[in-house]
């Protein structure tokens, strides 16, 4: 059994790839015919991911049962003493991620069957999903930095295709381009870091790189500043992929893609890749504490930034997007505190409840589109929602569970993982713990703000005047003739509600696997550290920090309830009128988009114009003048082409005499 699971692990990424390749090849070769086979194509891809999920859980069961880590390598290229190996590595952290990604992916695919059922590019969407899942699974299994970079780029390519899936929409096309460009910045640094580490260690293997770097740092063969630079270059990749400040700006715009892919990107694939890589590189980063401090500070800034901007969002999906940025900041804070178990545990718990929240938002948007139309300006605006719990009870209940989980209220999953991060931060950097604790209160507030605006109160979708106001504010035209006759929403079909119900189970229960007095998740990943932590566990240390976290989260929920459930205060209007500077700062997203636009976008365009001007005035002119000079020289020389032998003899004689005179002088 153990041997069979390890031997079949290579099939986990291959099966979804084969499915995506077959359907994709069919779309290219027989587009019309394959598009007519919508259900068979989807069934093929769902089945391939389903088999991968079964194999992933077999591998995870092996690791839980004590199976040793295994690595299968083959020589890809060799030259002299250099040998580039590819293959796969199976260990507890990889097995856990395989199970997570495949589980969320298959639930998203089932959900997509309902959500995308009327889309003309249904088959293309499933093809992209299959390729996306395959790329992430292969990334998880990669045994070295070079192989992980290959699949890192494939994940980025798939996210570009899926964010811009509705490329007819200008906003979607621009969002895909923005995601691509921002991630290229991070990936450029990542590639430089990989090459620099190979230069320093002559290896791409994670463990060998860490061991040799430690030896080089200790004997002084690599300066401390160079080690810091290499580690920070490597970190640029995760900064972009996991949306860390200041490379987070692509993630909110990525909401222009279909909602199922938002769930997959935010829960288990693209943004998870960065955190996973930092966990893989923990043996290296632990050798350079200065880098860990930088990672922790960036994570703290990111978690506060995301939470603060989420406070004023009216777009349901963008509110969840900034929530993801904030939670990713918590994960990086854990990594910077030297607590990869805490970071990975929060990655796991967050994946389940954030996938549920995004799929729940998709269910809401799907229902709203039947009332207000398919324009995201209306279908995703919470000012047109309200009271949806009455008509969409399953979506409402599961969304509520997700809000409680992410707010860190016990005994749901988010409490255990977030509390562990805050505990590690308190031990390492008390100031960062304070920011993280305050952010926990903001998280509870904005999540219940989302819930109350969407599911409680009265339905506002039939307010024609409000629709017109929102469209005009967005610079769009309003046509009363196009308003829908349907007056109310309804619950989504079983394909969309079943994944919500399934995801609600781990959102409630999985946190118990990481309880501080019996951390089974930690025992799987780092058994020695988990045993030591269990021995030194103290209720006297745990309870004060846990109570502080729960109290501040409860305060956030209470304030949200007063403002958005009972409407005792108009919090939004009060902040906008009394704290204009702060409100404008948050509305403009810390002005980071404008800064990027001014410095990088306008700067690069200005530089391009100057280069174009230089090309036209100097280079083009030089080329033209060279051509004209050649033509003039040719015309002048043509006068010597007389056809008279005497003239040619005279020229030869003159040339010989000239050479004799020149050489005599030399």
Swiss-Prot record:
Highest taxon above the source species: Eukaryota
Keyword terms: Membrane, NAD, NADP, Organellar chromatophore, Plastid, Plastoquinone, Quinone, Thylakoid, Translocase, Transmembrane, Transmembrane helix, Transport
Main location: plastid
Top-level class of the enzyme under EC nomenclature: translocase
Membrane topology: Multi-pass membrane protein
EC number: 7.1.1.-
Record field: catalytic activity: a plastoquinone + NADH + (n+1) H(+)(in) = a plastoquinol + NAD(+) + n H(+)(out); a plastoquinone + NADPH + (n+1) H(+)(in) = a plastoquinol + NADP(+) + n H(+)(out)
Cell location: Plastid, Organellar chromatophore thylakoid membrane
Family statement: Belongs to the complex I subunit 5 family.
The organism of origin for this protein: Paulinella chromatophora
Assembly notes: NDH is composed of at least 16 different subunits, 5 of which are encoded in the nucleus.
GO process terms (BP): ATP synthesis coupled electron transport; electron transport coupled proton transport
Protein name: NAD(P)H-quinone oxidoreductase subunit 5, organellar chromatophore 1
Stated role: NDH shuttles electrons from NAD(P)H:plastoquinone, via FMN and iron-sulfur (Fe-S) centers, to quinones in the photosynthetic chain and possibly in a chloroplast respiratory chain. The immediate electron acceptor for the enzyme in this species is believed to be plastoquinone. Couples the redox reaction to proton translocation, and thus conserves the redox energy in a proton gradient.
Entry GO MF terms: NADH dehydrogenase (ubiquinone) activity; quinone binding
A GO cellular component entry from the record: plastid
One Pfam family hit: Proton_antipo_N
InterPro entries assigned to the protein according to its UniProt record, in alphabetical order: NADH_UbQ_OxRdtase_chlpt_su5_C, NADHpl_OxRdtase_5_subgr, ND/Mrp_TM, NU5C-like, Proton_antipo_N
Keyword Aminoacyl-tRNA synthetase: no
Gene3D superfamilies reported in the protein's UniProt record: 1.20.5.2700
């Amino acid at each position: 059994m153990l041997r069979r699971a390890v031997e079949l692990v290579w099939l986990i990424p291959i099966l979804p790839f084969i499915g995506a390749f077959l359907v994709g090849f069919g779309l290219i070769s027989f587009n019309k015919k394959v598009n007519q086979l919508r259900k068979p194509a989807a069934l093929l891809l769902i089945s391939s991911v389903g088999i991968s999920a079964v194999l992933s859980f077999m591998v995870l069961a092996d690791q839980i049962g004590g199976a040793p880590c295994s690595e299968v390598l083959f020589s890809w290229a060799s030259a002299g003493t250099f040998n580039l190996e590819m293959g796969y590595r199976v260990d507890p952290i990889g097995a856990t991620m395989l199970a997570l990604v495949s589980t969320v992916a298959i639930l998203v695919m089932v959900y997509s069957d309902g959500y995308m059922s009327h889309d003309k590019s249904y088959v293309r969407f499933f093809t992209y999903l299959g390729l996306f899942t395959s790329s992430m699974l292969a990334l998880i299994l990669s045994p070295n930095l070079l192989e992980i970079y290959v699949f890192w780029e494939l994940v980025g390519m798939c996210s570009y295709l899926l964010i811009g899936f509705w490329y007819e929409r200008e906003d979607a096309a621009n969002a895909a381009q923005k995601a691509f460009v921002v991630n290229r910045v991070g990936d450029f640094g990542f590639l430089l870091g990989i090459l620099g580490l190979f230069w320093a260690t002559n290896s791409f293997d994670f463990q060998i790189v860490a061991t040799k770097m430690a030896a080089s740092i200790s004997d002084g063969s690599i300066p401390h500043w160079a080690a810091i630079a290499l580690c920070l270059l490597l970190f640029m990749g995760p900064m972009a992929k996991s949306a860390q400040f200041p490379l987070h700006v692509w993630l909110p715009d990525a909401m222009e893609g279909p909602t199922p892919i938002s769930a997959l990107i935010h829960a288990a694939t693209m943004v998870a890749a960065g955190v996973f890589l930092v966990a893989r590189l923990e043996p290296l980063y632990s050798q350079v504490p200065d880098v860990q401090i930088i990672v922790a500070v960036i994570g703290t800034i990111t978690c506060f930034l995301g939470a603060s901007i989420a406070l004023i969002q009216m777009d349901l999906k963008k509110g969840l997007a900034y929530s993801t940025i904030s939670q990713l900041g918590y994960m990086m804070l854990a990594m910077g505190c030297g607590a990869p178990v805490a970071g990975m545990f929060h990655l796991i718990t967050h994946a389940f409840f954030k996938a549920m929240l995004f799929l729940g938002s998709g269910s809401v948007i799907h229902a709203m589109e039947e009332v207000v139309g398919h324009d995201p300006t209306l279908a995703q605006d919470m000012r047109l929602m309200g009271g949806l719990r009455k008509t969409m009870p399953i979506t409402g209940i599961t969304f509520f569970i997700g809000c409680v989980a992410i707010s860190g209220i016990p005994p749901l999953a988010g409490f255990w993982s977030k509390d562990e991060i805050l505990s590690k931060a308190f031990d390492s950097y008390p100031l960062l713990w304070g920011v993280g604790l305050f952010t926990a209160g903001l998280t509870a507030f904005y999540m219940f703000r989302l819930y109350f605006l969407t599911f409680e109160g009265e339905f506002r979708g039939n307010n024609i005047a409000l629709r017109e106001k929102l469209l005009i504010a967005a610079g769009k035209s309003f046509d009363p003739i196009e308003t829908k006759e349907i007056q109310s929403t309804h619950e989504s079909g079983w394909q969309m509600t079943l994944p919500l119900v399934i995801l609600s189970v781990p959102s409630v229960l999985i946190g118990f696997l990481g309880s501080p007095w019996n951390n089974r998740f930690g025992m799987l990943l780092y058994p020695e550290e988990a045993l030591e932590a269990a021995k030194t566990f103290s209720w006297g240390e745990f309870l004060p920090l846990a109570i502080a976290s729960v109290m501040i989260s409860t305060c956030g929920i209470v304030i949200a309830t007063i403002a958005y459930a009972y409407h005792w205060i108009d919090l939004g209007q009060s902040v906008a009128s009394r704290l204009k500077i702060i409100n404008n700062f948050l509305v403009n997203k810390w002005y980071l988009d404008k800064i990027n636009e001014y410095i990088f976008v306008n700067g690069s365009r200005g530089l391009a114009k100057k280069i174009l001007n230089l090309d036209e005035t100097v280079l083009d002119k030089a080329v033209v003048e060279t051509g004209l000079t050649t033509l003039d020289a040719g015309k002048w020389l043509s006068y010597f082409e007389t056809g008279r032998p005497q003239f040619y003899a005279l020229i030869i004689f003159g040339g010989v005499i000239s050479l004799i005179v020149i050489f005599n002088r030399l």
